[in-house]
Amino acid sequence: VTDLDALQELLGPHTYPAHLALDGMHGTALPPLADHHVHLHLIDEAELAPHGIAAVVDLGGNPVALAHRLSSIPRVAYAGAFLTAPGGYPSGRPWAPEGIWREVRSPSDALGAPGGAATLVDEQAEFGASVIKVSLNAAAGPVLDAATLTAIVARAHERGMFVVAHVEGPGMARLAIEHGVDVLAHAPFSEPVEHDLIVRAVATRQRWISTLDIHAGDDRQRAATNLAAFADAGGTVLYGTDLGNGDRAPGVSAGELRALQDAGVRGPELIGTLTDPWPAQEPPHGVATFVPGPPPEAVDGIPEWLATARVVPREELAPDTH
């Protein structure tokens, strides 16, 4: 019999022992889990739910293809195309087919202005995007200037959309934080983030998506150090893997969870990075997470244990609590 208080102290208040009604398998139930940074055109999304992921956020894809998806599990929120400076990242990348980026040529807020900030935000919104993805990658080409970034953020907020930024290169984290970007697509990895910027990011309720495990060497260390400082200051961290970048299996990543734990995001806070429904207000309805077998005895066992999770219909779960 699992001690409910001990289980919830380890994994959070919405966790409980349960079994599958159809075959009697015992395990642990949790809310639906989300990967907040994927690229669906580079992965087999059918593999996500059997490996624990009930919701994803696609942060850069063809808005036409994304708009024509059928509603299913995993639930998909998306940004549509990257908005970038002329000649900027990710244009020309072998993994970035035509149609997944738009070049913003002016900060114009005039409706329908060719290449204008408002026009391109509106295009993504009309294709059903709930977030806007901007590229601020000074390490790989031109970047949006402050006026254009400000115009994109303003138009997106008018449309009720979050703005997510890829920040890479000198000064890019500062540019994003000082100009109202809501979410960083990666914990900043190319330079240390100064304390004043961490404080400002937390004060403005910015979120950072982890993606620690895609890095190695100095980039990984900088990302982990920056994320640890952000989390320690009270910042909101979201679990994300940049799935599709490199050869990673779909599903809950033990490597990403271990990296988060090493950065000080542990226990219920770690689970919270996965169960946060952002950008939605609520998690997917009608499904839950089931992890077969006994739960871990300590926080260090969570990553490998949670990597065996699967998505199940909520009606198939029977609580074991008494």
Regions found by a protein language model. Name each.
Residues 46-137, 141-157, 208-211:
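Divalent-metal coordination cores built from histidine and acidic residues
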